[in-house]
Structures are given as C-alpha cells and as structure tokens.
Amino acid sequence: MPFTGQDTLKTRRTLTVGDKEYDYFSIEVAEEAGLGDVSRLPFSLKVLLENLLRYEDGGSVTVDDAKALAAWLNTGSSSNEIAFRPARVLMQDFTGVPSVVDLAAMRQAMADMGGDPEKINPLNTCNLVIDHSVTAEFTGTADAMQKNIEKEFASNMERYTFLKWGQTAFSNFTVVPPGAGICHQVNLEFLAKTVWTEEEDGKTIAMPDTIVGTDSHTTMVNALSVLGWGVGGIEAEAVMLGQPVTMLIPEVIGFKLTGKMQEGILATDLVLRVVQMLRNKGVVGKFVEFFGPGLEQLSLPDQATLANMAPEYGATCGFFPIDAGTIKYLELTARSQETIQLVEAYAKAQGLWRDADTPDPQFTDTI
C-alpha cells in the first residue's frame, strides 16, 4: 500500500534526526505554497492536514481538500468531506475476531479461484489486544491471577488458537496475548508512538501516529497526541484493507485549562466537571482540543483520563498536543531513544509542538 501520493504542492522534505533521515510532508511549506496561515489551525486539524498532504493523489484526496481544510480558519467550520487514512487499527478480541474470520474467508475464496491466498493481508498495521475475555472467578489469594488466566485460556481455547494462527498467517497483524492489560492501556503504554514511520521505496516516511479502534474508548490515546476514535467493525476492516475514513471537517472546541489541581483532587474529580461542562456546551460530532497553561500541571496519565471520557462528553475525541510531558511519558514507558528524538524533532519541524510560548490556536469556540 502506498503511503504517499503525487505531492502536487511539493511539500515533501527531509528531516535528519541523529544519523537517520526521514521524509515528511511539511505543513510549513504548504503554507508557503498558498494554503494560507495554517499555523493557526488547531493541532488536531494540523494532523488531518498532514494526512491530506501526504496522501494527495488527485483522486480520493485532492489539493482542493487541503485548501478546504485551510479555509476552515475563515469560519471555524466546514461542509467539506475529506478522506482520512489512519496509520493503525486497534481491536479487542470480541470485535476483532469477526475481522480475522473475514480475512480468512477472503483467503479461502482466493484459493478457490486458483490464486495465492497469502496475498490477502491487512494493508495497515493492525493490533488486536485480547482483554475482553477476562473473568475473576478466583479472588483474595496470591495465585488468583494465575488461576484466572488459566481458566480464561481453558474457556476460550478455540478463539485464542484461531487468533494465534491469524498472527502467524497475516502480515501487518499482531495479537497481544491475554494478561497483558486492557487494550487502551497497552495502546498508550506500548503500541502508540506519537510519530509513526513506514518504509517506502527505500525511504523512511515520518507521519503523525493516528488510529481508529473498535472500542469507543480508543480516544484515550489522544492524550499522547495520537489522533483517533472508535469506529464500527466494518469501518475498521475497511481501514485494515487500505480504505479511508470519510468524514466532514469537524468543528474544534478549545477547552482552556489554567491553574492546577489542589491537593486531594483527583483526575476523576476533574473529568466529571469537564464532562458536565462539555455536555452543557454540546460537542457531539466535534473535536475537543485542550489548551492553556494548565496543561503543564497535568500529568499524562491525568490527561489520558480526560481523553478516555470523550464518549461520555459526546465528542469525537479530546486531543492533547505534543509537549515536554509527552516526551517525559515516552521516556517513562521505555520507548526507544530513536523514537523519542524523532517525536520531538518532527513535532517542532511540523508546528505540532506546544510550550508556554506557543500562541493559542484558532478554534470554532472555546470554553
């Protein structure tokens, strides 16, 4: 699957990080090419703009799509549809099994027609985390966890055997086994990279990490500046097979955070208040993006609590920009130094980095 288009606006540039070179599609160059002052876009829309610049092929994505997104600045809204291609798909075992069954059926059909069944593979990276089969039949003893895992394997042996076959049979498809944690936790702590890379024609392409998942709380990873949300199983399969998510360019509500939480106040207290405010505002079908000096006082796990609750306040996602806290969390969770250095360098090159001196973006409305 191609990860780049025809680049009509000539925005492709090279970024050197350490001793490695990455190609990327520059938002700054797009601005110089006549798109307008896109540096004022919300960070979440900059991620969508980069996606359009990278996949612009004159067909499913055109220069007019990028211009329409840039024109969003005029009114803070748009009636234009765009084709968004996420970098990854996240599944859990209940919603993911039917997708693997469909892929297996496609392979069987290919074999029946005399073709090579091994040509049937996900085109985008797909991670399936087995976490929805957890039961707690044993409690209160030192070996309770081990007994529960053994019971889980015994009860779900056919499904787990099938999924293990899927991991060995398909490329771009990995399964995280039972007992590793909840899919959103695994995604945040292990799978997400903030800046994704793919190899194409001997070049390494750097891009924002983006995702759709088959669980509504996929939004949790927006705390790590990974733009994403939950979709249905059919949409997820389509993305696995290289198809875009068609969406209206969303309105973006800015939620300004100031000050810091007092001692004894927890992230759950904060999120309940935020949910109340956003429900009163009405943010269904919209992006929420958090900004303001208060971001520096929130740890990334606390930000993840706010991002996780996007389905409760009705927004498509609750996005946090890349900042020093993002880098600190990537270090805390033992991401590679190569990844951490790339995230900081790429974010600064693309205008996706936020610090105390960064001007506030232009939003549809603010709270």
How should these model regions be labeled?
Residues 1-367:
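Fe-S-dependent hydro-lyases/dehydratases of central metabolism
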